[in-house]
Every structure is written in C-alpha cells, then in structure tokens.
A protein has these predicted regions:
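Glycine-rich, charge-decorated loop segments at or immediately adjacent to ligand/cofactor-binding or catalytic sites
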Residues: 136-151
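Conserved N-terminal substructure of TIR/SEFIR domains
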Residues: 24-97, 172
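Conserved TIR/SEFIR loop-to-helix hotspot centered on a Trp-containing motif
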Residues: 107-124
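A short helix->loop->beta-strand "cap" motif at the edges of active sites that frequently abuts
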Residues: 125-132
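A charged, well-structured terminal subsegment
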Residues: 160-172
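Short, positively charged and aromatic/hydrophobic N-terminal segments
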Residues: 16-17, 23
C-alpha cells in the first residue's frame, strides 16, 4: 500500500487541548493538535474475485480512509510456492496486526477453504469482522454473516463508516 498526501485529505480530526504555559493569558494557554487515524485493514479475498477486492480498496480511498493493507499480496511467493501451513502462518501474522477484518459475504465465501480459518484467526485475536454484501447478490454466506460484527452494503460510505466505527484503534 502506498501513502500519499491525498490519503489524508478527508482525515478524521481529533482535537486535544493542552496547557502550554499557565502564565500566559487564558486565550493563549491552549494549543490544538490534529491526529490522523491510520487503519490497519485485512481484506479477506479469493484471487478468483480480485476485482471485488480492488473495489473494496477503492471504496476506502474514495471515502478518505487512510489505511495500511494487511492482506497477503497476490504476488507473494507463499501463494505460488509455499505450503498451506506457510500461507496460514502468513495470514495469521497479518490478521494479528490488523485493526479489523473485511470479508465479502458472497456465496463463494462459504466454499473457500480459507474463510473459516480467517474468521477463526480474527476471533482468536478479537478483531472486528466487517461483512460486505456484494452488490446484486441474491445469496450470501451464512458463515460470514454469523461471524460478522456488522454487515454493510456494497457502497463506499457504508464500508468506510463500518471501518471508522468498528476498527480497533492501533498506532503504526
């Protein structure tokens, strides 16, 4: 994931007031600081459905969410040359360090051999699970819906609001 100035355009502003010098006049005693929230997000995905994965990333950027992508990248050699154990360990390390897990609640999720493991890992480390219902999907995965802390629709605003409301506050 790359970071640019544009990542911080629509940041969440939090103001803190602190005492600078008690001898100053009251209106000069305070200073306001703005913090930028950076989320660590694991987006569960099947590389067969990588366009949905890309769309989730674009939803987050579109809504001004500054985030570090904790997902295991497609070009990681573990995907092609590694064992299931190595991939499982890589996913667990990524989930352990994230603020929240986003899972597409499409029917394919029910048949993915990794979804249950990712859900189990998220629960093990008390990571909130955000389920996103794919646009126009008639059927969704009960496995994902039952594990989710929140289920949102297929649009940028609802995905971004879920991240803001459910992600665990962590610093990079």
């Amino acid at each position: 994931m790359f970071f640019s100035r544009n990542s911080f355009v629509n940041h969440k502003k939090i103001s803190y007031i602190c005492s600078v010098n008690s001898k100053l006049k009251p209106w000069r005693r305070t200073r306001e600081f703005t913090l930028f929230i950076m989320y660590r997000i694991f987006i569960s995905h099947s590389w067969s459905y990588s366009s949905d994965y890309d769309k989730i990333e674009s939803f987050l950027r579109q809504e001004g969410i500054a985030f570090y992508n904790h997902s295991v990248p497609k070009n990681d050699p573990i995907h092609t040359n590694g064992t299931d154990k190595q991939l499982s360990d890589a996913i667990e390390a990524k989930v352990k360090g994230c603020s929240c897990v986003i899972i597409l609640a499409g029917v394919y999720a029910t048949y993915s051999k990794w979804i249950n493991k990712e859900i189990e890992m998220a629960k093990k480390y008390s990571k909130p699970i955000i389920a996103v219902q794919p646009w126009g999907a008639e059927h969704t995965s009960n496995v994902v819906k039952n594990a989710a802390d929140v289920i949102v629709g297929w649009n940028a605003k609802s995905v971004a609001n879920a991240v803001r409301n459910y992600a665990i506050n962590q610093s990079l």
